[in-house]
Amino acid sequence: MSSSSNRQVILVIASQAYVVYTLLSLISLGLVGDTPTFYIFGDSGVDVGNNLYINTIAKPVFPNGIDFGKPFGTPSGRYSNGRISVDFIAQELGLKNFPAPYLAPTTVGDVLLNGVNYASSGSGILNSTGNFLGRVISLENQIRYFNRTRQDIISNIGIRDAKKLLAGAIYIVATGGNDVGSSIPQRNSSSDGLASLDLRFDTILSALRSELIKLYELGARKFVVVNSPPFGCAPFVRDVLSKRDGCVSLENQMSQMYNRKLKSMLEELTKNLTGSQYVNADSYAMQEDIIQNYIQYGFQDVNNACCYVVGAHGGIVPCVTISQVCWDRTSYVFWDPFHLTETAHGIVAKHMLDGDSKYMQPMNIRKLSTT
């Protein structure tokens, strides 16, 4: 074979190798293929460990994480016995690792390309929410952290690929429950009752709207915004306001009032922000479905916290080191005074991934990931 032919063969092999290398690199960055990248914002419902790195009393100490799979006695950073909804979603869609907590020292470099979790237990939409707990990371500060992530990604892979990665990613925003819950004193002190919260909820949602637009301006396009769960069904609310089995209707009406306003706002954002899709994840409907049909889902207890200290429903004290823990965690809906068990989280995740318009409007996460 002539030297000219040898050079041609070498060039062909080199070009093919380069194409394969480039394709593999793009797949690993989430720029090619079916596995989306997730950036997650919110409160204790989706926190996976950020609060372990800050000065706050809102830390999910053991027995939180008792079934997570780490060495016994090691906190998982989650307010549950095991995995939470965002973990199930990540696994189902093929992510090799859960999106890492932003404040973990190992969340740097290529880890940022596979998704990051900025959520902080006790936080809310308003900067003042959760301040009594010590330091919490408000939604505004979570998005500031995301902006730093964005700059690091641009430095790592260049602005063109960064824009593509960020536009194709899914942004889960699961916050507002603590803002709704902290509205109870205002409602109780007003002769107008629920009507007195109209302006407060407008203020909360105006702040949320501003933060969602910031994310859009930073390159986000696919949003999943989780609404307020049925607050009146939590063991804490039952113990403090009712003492009886069954949900507290007035607290649930608060959540419903907030959720109606949120849904309208998300529809307006999708209409007015070019190329955006704001999905309303109806956490209220998902948890209501579990509570109303708990026997069909295989649960035995829908009223009490599995991890408990005191209270008719175990709802007075958070899950802490002195707590008692139920033996069969799969039979309980509620893990602690506010949060769900791993089994219940798995059902919520299934609704978010594949649920119809009763739970996800206008589409579920699986469909959003392919648009």
What are these regions (language model features)?
Residues 2-371:
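Conserved active-site regions of diverse hydrolases
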